[in-house]
Amino acid sequence: MPLVPRSLRGTNGMVDCQQGGLRYWRRMGGAEERMVGIGGGGRGVANTRDAIVAAARREFLSKGFHEASLRSIASEAGVTTGAIYGYFSSKEALLGAAVGNVGEGLCELCQRAFVEFESRSIEERSFSNMGAYEEHVQLRIIDYIYDHHDEFSLIAQHPVATRWERDLDCLAELEVRSTRAYGSELRAAGWDVRDPNPLVLEVIARQFFQALLQPIVRGVGREEARAFITEYGRFYYEGARALMEPQEPQGSAAGAVQASQGS
């Protein structure tokens, strides 16, 4: 973006700018300077930004981050290349906008699922019921990923540049914390449950959530991805069972059945 004459500088760090056929106010000084107002005709700032982001998403998906051309993005969005820098401080920032907050949204989905499960009685949260509930949640996760197919495709291609590692940390931490809390509650209710090594839990959890992107990477459809997560989730559940070795209290109905089967 060309230097702005002092005569056009407003108060509170605002600058009167004109670029790409638009006249707007720009707030200076941030890591990613923002368009905060529009004047003089033309389409609105939000619409222009959305057009740039949509064009960038298509360009990144088609050519990858390194080969993507800002000039092509600008041309498709109907703005100048310089206008892009009025909205985004770098190509990396533009990629981040193209992905949006879908990783954070996935963390929130899992957090809500954990809270929902924890709100149930301990009887409703037996290990077998937990497996059935997890299968339901995993299908919701796959649907969420496919509802944001393009964004997660970009994440799979560029995990570091899109903050996926941070989101993966969040997901793994949620899984480890909820698993250990669940084990503690079962023990308090009279179950015999091992407390797995936290590092083992973290590694397994990260691998599980990372694998959720594989259907996207391999180009399979939603229904095939749902079949994948159902089978993969069962494998994960049986692994958790092997680590925790849960034994229900002998006084419970399930425990009585288990005891009769063992006699």
Which residues make up each language-model segment?
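Helix-turn-helix
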Residues: 51, 55, 59-93, 97-98
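C-terminal/domain-terminus segments
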Residues: 57, 155-172, 227-240
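C-terminal peripheral helix-coil segments that are non-catalytic and often amphipathic
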Residues: 2-36, 147, 177-184, 199-263
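Amphipathic alpha-helical packing segments from all-alpha helical-bundle domains
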Residues: 136, 140-147, 156, 160-188, ...
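Hydrophobic alpha-helical connector segments
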Residues: 97, 111-144
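Short, basic, alpha-helical segments at the C-terminal edge of helix-turn-helix-like DNA-binding modules
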Residues: 70, 100-107, 114
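Short linear capping/connector segments at secondary-structure termini
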Residues: 120-127, 155-162, 189-193
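Regular secondary-structure segments
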Residues: 57, 107, 111-114, 118, ...
